[in-house]
Amino acid sequence: MDYFPMIFSLLFVAFQGAPEAAVLGAELSTGPDSRGEKPAPSAPWRPRRSKRCSCSSLMDKECVYFCHLDIIWVNTPEHIVPYGLGSPSRSKRSLKDLFITKATDHRKRCQCASQKDKKCWTFCQAGKELREQDSMEKGWNGHKKGKDCSELGEKSKQQQLVAGRKIRRLDAISNSIKTAFRVAKLKAELYRENKVTHNRTH
C-alpha cells in the first residue's frame, strides 16, 4: 500500500494550519483554571498617544502644540499643520467625570492630565489670566471713551466717526495688499509648474 501521498498531504495541511492551532492551543491552555493567569487579549495592542493636557479650543495653536507631545508640526507656506491629531485612542469616560469637567471654569485655556505637572498648570492658568487681563483692559478703555464722549458731546461723536473711517480705510488697504500678494504667489506657482512640465517634456 502506498500511504506516502496521503501522509504528505496530511502533513502539508497540518503545517499550514499550525500557527492558528498553536494560538488556539495557547488560549485553551491559559483558561481560568490554569494557575489564575489572564488570557491574552485578542485585539492588537495600540500605543496610546501621549497627551499632556486637553485644550478648550483646537484653534489655540500654542495650546495644541504644548498639550499634544507627539504631534509632528510641519511648516507649510500657508500655516503650520499638525499631523497626528486624527483618531486618537480614547478611554471611556464616566458621567461623574463629565459633571466635574463642566463644573470647572470653562474659561480655562486647557485641562491638565496630571495634577502633579506644575508646568502644565502654570501654562493653563497663565492663559486664563491673560484673557481676563485683556477683557479688563478692553472694558477700561471702553469706559474711558464713554467718559470722554459724555464730556465733549458732538465733537467726540465726530471724532469716533473719523476714527472708524480711518480704521476701515486701513483695513481696505491691508486687504488689497494681501490679495495682491496672493495673486503674485499664485502666478509664481503657475510659472513654476509650467517650467517643471516644460523641463520634463524635453
Swiss-Prot record:
Gene Ontology BP annotations: adenylate cyclase-inhibiting G protein-coupled receptor signaling pathway; artery smooth muscle contraction; axon extension; axonogenesis involved in innervation; body fluid secretion; branching involved in blood vessel morphogenesis; calcium ion transmembrane transport; calcium-mediated signaling
Site (Cleavage): W73, V74
Propeptide: 26-50, 74-202
GO cellular component, one term: cytoplasm
Cited InterPro entries: Endothelin, Endothelin_toxin_CS, Endothln-like_toxin
Signal peptide region: 1-25
Predominant localisation class: secreted
Localization annotation: Secreted
Disulfide bonds: C53-C67, C55-C63
Keyword match Transport: no
GO MF term set: cytokine activity; endothelin A receptor binding; endothelin B receptor binding; hormone activity
Region (Disordered): 28-49, 135-155
Keywords linked to the UniProt accession: Cleavage on pair of basic residues, Disulfide bond, Secreted, Signal, Vasoactive, Vasoconstrictor
Segments of this protein annotated with the region Endothelin-like: 110-124
Function: Endothelins are endothelium-derived vasoconstrictor peptides. Probable ligand for G-protein coupled receptors EDNRA and EDNRB which activates PTK2B, BCAR1, BCAR3 and, GTPases RAP1 and RHOA cascade in glomerular mesangial cells. Also binds the DEAR/FBXW7-AS1 receptor. Promotes mesenteric arterial wall remodeling via activation of ROCK signaling and subsequent colocalization of NFATC3 with F-actin filaments. NFATC3 then translocates to the nucleus where it subsequently promotes the transcription of the smooth muscle hypertrophy and differentiation marker ACTA2.
Membership in a protein family: Belongs to the endothelin/sarafotoxin family.
The protein's name in its UniProt record: Endothelin-1
Species classification: Eukaryota, Metazoa, Chordata, Craniata, Vertebrata
Gene: EDN1
